[in-house]
């Protein structure tokens, strides 16, 4: 099943900084929202929940939103640094780091990737307002680094499918609030269950693919993101 996750999409050419459309550096007080996709999904696949939400969030004043492939964490990190470099000197000052407003969300392997990215930002002294993981897959996707203010986790544990991370916890509970560890259920043979967009996903993706296709999940993710956008 893990092999299926990696092969479920056709491999595409790698994403680069020039594929990201947000203005750099970010305008003052703007929030940068980065969604990271699972599997080997293409960064601009319009059928993926990560991409759909990024495009929707772009319509919000004061928000810059991008979707990034999980193999491109380095690209995401460079983009964030470029976005925060308000004076263009390629060195982030204490003030430039302090003013960062960053939100990260990811699905499947993208859930693990956003925590890799958050840890890299932590090493650079860059704060993160929120991380949201959707059916996150990975060995290091349950400890939320101390630079993250709040975190939420959604998962499923149905039979014959990839299981998402069940419980995230804060490396430092005094600095990070865990908002949710919420389980979704997708029983087999339920007629009104979410339906993935392709036959391959419907046939072999199981509940992991159904969760990715569930609009209720993405409404929850969006709700947490919009709450974080109000944070001062």
Residue ranges and their predicted role:
Residues 1-9:
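Bacterial N-terminal signal peptides
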Residues 152-232:
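C-terminal catalytic-base region of ester-bond hydrolases, centering on the histidine
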Residues 22-100, 203:
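Active-site catalytic motif of lipid deacylating hydrolases and related acyltransferases
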Residues 12-14:
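Boundary at the C-terminal end of the N-terminal hydrophobic targeting segment
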Residues 39-50, 69, 73, 107-114, ...:
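Solvent-exposed, acidic/flexible segments
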Residues 81-169:
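Serine-dependent carboxylesterase/thioesterase catalytic core
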Residues 58-67, 123-130, 231:
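Structural alpha-beta junctions
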């Amino acid at each position: 099943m893990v092999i299926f996750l990696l092969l479920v999409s056709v491999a595409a050419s790698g994403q680069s900084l020039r594929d990201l459309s947000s203005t750099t550096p970010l305008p003052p007080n703007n929030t940068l929202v980065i969604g990271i996709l699972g599997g080997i999904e293409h960064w601009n696949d319009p059928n993926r929940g990560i991409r759909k939400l990024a495009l929707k969030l772009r319509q919000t004043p004061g928000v810059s939103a991008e979707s990034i492939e999980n193999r491109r964490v380095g690209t995401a990190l460079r983009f964030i640094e470029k976005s925060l470099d308000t004076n263009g000197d390629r060195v982030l000052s204490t003030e430039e780091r302090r003013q960062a407003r960053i939100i990260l969300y990811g699905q499947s392997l993208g859930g693990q990737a956003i925590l890799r990215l958050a840890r890299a930002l932590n090493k650079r002294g860059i704060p993160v307002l929120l991380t949201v993981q959707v059916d996150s897959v990975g060995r290091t996707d349950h400890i939320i680094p101390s630079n993250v203010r709040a975190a939420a986790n959604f998962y499923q544990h149905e039979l014959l499918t990839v299981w998402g991370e069940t419980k995230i916890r804060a490396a430092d509970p005094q600095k990070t609030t865990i908002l949710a560890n919420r389980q979704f259920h997708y029983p087999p043979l339920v007629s009104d269950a979410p339906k993935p967009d392709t036959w391959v996903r419907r046939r072999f993706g199981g509940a992991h693919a159904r969760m990715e296709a569930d609009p209720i999940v993405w409404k929850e993710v969006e709700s947490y993101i919009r709450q974080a956008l109000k944070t001062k």
